[in-house]
C-alpha cells in the first residue's frame, strides 16, 4: 500500500491517489466516471452538513462526518487532475494570482 510522506504537498497527495487507484483497480475509470462520482460525494457532503446543522434529514440515510466527505471529494479532485495532467499546486497558485486582481464586493 502506498504511503504519504510527513507533511505532504499537493503533489504528494496527487501521486498517492494515483498509486491508490492503481492498487485498488480504479486507474481505468474515465474522467467522466470520476466527475460523476465527485458529484455524488458533494451530495453526501451536503447531507452531512444538513445533519450537523440540525436540518431535516432522511432518517433512513447513512451519514458520515463532514471531514470524511471532504476527504472523498479531495481524492476525486486529485484523480480528475491526474487524468488531465494538472498539477494542483501550480494551478492553485496561478488561479489565486488571477483572483487577487478581482474586486470582491459585499452584497
Language model features: what each stretch is:
Residues 1-70, 74-107:
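Flexible "arm" and connector segments at domain edges
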